[in-house]
């Protein structure tokens, strides 16, 4: 079956280190010159998608595997002096500028649109942001999209407090449809049939006290994610999307 890529969107789920699966898929797309006019990514999917949109094959894999092995950029030690479980200085300053420079010009000149999903802490709703001119804003959006709740500081974009987009929209296929792409390729990082435990999550009273709507969506994120998974499987069965996912459970933690 030949795909009409001119009218298809690309949706990239997050998932932290499970995103190495996405890296392989995107490198395959680049090897075969498969390009989409529109893409949208969440958290790790946003970061990996940026390298795809700048046509830098292997860059996302390097950041997820090689750079992790060399620099060990995830750990409790970073909470001490960066207030984050991730070495955000390495990831969003040193890596894109020095270790494996991001090709901003190639990204800017790519006619395809690319949106990244964040969660607005004030409203508890998803924000869909894109940037093709301002390097600092682009990095801020990517950082916000990947700022895990509880273990990463809030990131400000356009003066608004933001956290990981996966809190409210982990698989933003409906956003792609709203943007005019009725058919989509959806790259997932969980096997078909996976569901999260829907135990009630009680957000400690002393956390995010300034953001009551954020607290509400954090308490419901498992239910919302499971609803999205059910929708994705239904749309796949109906032939409305092409889902690319691991065949078996990925045995790796989100931040392992």
Where does each model-flagged region fall?
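Patatin-like phospholipase
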Residues: 1-42, 50-256
């Amino acid at each position: 079956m030949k795909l009409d890529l001119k009218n298809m969107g690309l949706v990239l789920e997050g998932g932290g280190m499970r995103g190495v699966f996405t890296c392989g898929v995107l490198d395959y797309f680049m090897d075969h010159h498969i390009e989409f006019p529109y893409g949208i990514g969440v958290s790790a999917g946003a970061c990996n998608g940026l390298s795809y949109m700048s046509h830098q094959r292997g860059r996302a894999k390097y950041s997820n595997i090689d750079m992790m092995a060399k620099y060990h950029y995830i750990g409790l030690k970073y909470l001490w002096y960066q207030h984050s479980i991730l070495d955000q200085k390495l990831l969003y300053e040193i890596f894109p500028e020095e270790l494996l420079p991001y090709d901003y010009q190639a990204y800017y000149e790519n006619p395809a649109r690319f949106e990244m999903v964040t969660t607005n802490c004030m409203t508890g709703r998803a924000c869909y942001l894109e940037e093709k001119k301002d390097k600092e804003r682009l990095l801020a959006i990517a950082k916000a999209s990947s700022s895990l709740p509880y273990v990463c500081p809030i990131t400000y974009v356009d003066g608004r407090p933001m956290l990981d987009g996966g809190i409210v929209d982990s698989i933003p296929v409906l956003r792609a449809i709203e943007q005019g792409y009725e058919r989509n390729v959806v790259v997932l990082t969980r096997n078909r049939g996976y569901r999260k435990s829907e135990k009630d999550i009680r957000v400690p009273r002393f956390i995010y006290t300034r953001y009551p709507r954020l607290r509400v969506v954090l308490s419901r994120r498992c239910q919302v994610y499971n609803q999205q998974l059910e929708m994705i499987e239904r749309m796949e069965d109906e032939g409305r999307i092409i889902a690319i996912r691991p065949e078996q459970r990925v045995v790796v933690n989100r931040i392992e």
